């Protein structure tokens, strides 16, 4: 499972490979292809200065989540693919709002991106726990397409935790076990993959002494 996902990501490391893949499912002259291309370009530009803790360009994560949807989960809906490419833009990039996404793309994409995004911490007077509880409630009743994006996002985050601190790894593992796995089980999406990814991370904490 995880090895297949890693192979998919390795085989599509850049723009050329990504759009060769998109061209297999959507004509280059179609509105769907143009929509995905616009989302790709918008996201790449918005995140051009952002990097992950591992040092990797942040946009690689956004592209990887969309690849998991396309290649592993066989998503063929252009709105969902575009939303996957844009899924962190409301939460992480100043100046982007749900209304702006709707104007730039469409209301469905904007709604999907909103559903997978935490709201600004200022709304909760800096209380991260309350913000997380509110977000979990929102995602718990979200439409299936939003859940698919979020679970693919969470899976990719877990399989790339190697570049983060042990404290963050433990926090992400607990959160996934407590909240995301039950949602995955409810929708029957990526259950075994998340379990396998969590097992990998936890095994990495074990030091075998000879």
How would you describe each model-predicted region?
Residues 1-210:
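Active-site helical microenvironments for divalent-metal-assisted chemistry
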């Amino acid at each position: 499972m995880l090895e297949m996902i890693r192979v998919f990501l390795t085989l599509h490391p850049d723009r050329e490979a990504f759009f060769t893949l998109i061209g297999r499912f959507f004509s280059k002259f179609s509105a769907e292809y143009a929509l995905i291309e616009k989302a790709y370009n918008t996201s790449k530009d918005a995140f051009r200065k952002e990097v992950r803790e591992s040092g990797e360009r942040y946009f690689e994560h956004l592209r990887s989540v969309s690849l998991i949807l396309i290649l592993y989960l066989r998503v063929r809906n252009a709105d969902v693919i575009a939303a996957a490419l844009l899924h962190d833009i409301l939460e992480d990039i100043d100046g982007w709002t749900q209304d702006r996404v709707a104007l730039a793309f469409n209301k469905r994409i904007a709604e999907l991106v909103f559903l997978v995004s935490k709201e600004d911490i200022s709304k909760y007077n800096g209380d991260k726990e309350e913000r997380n509880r509110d977000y979990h409630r929102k995602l718990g009743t979200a439409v299936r397409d939003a859940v698919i994006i979020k679970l693919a996002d969470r899976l990719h985050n877990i399989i790339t935790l190697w570049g983060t601190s042990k404290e963050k790894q433990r926090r992400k593992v607990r959160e996934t076990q407590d909240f995301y796995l039950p949602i995955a089980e409810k929708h029957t999406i990526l259950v075994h993959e998340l379990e396998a990814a969590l097992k990998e991370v936890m095994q990495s904490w074990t030091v075998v002494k000879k």
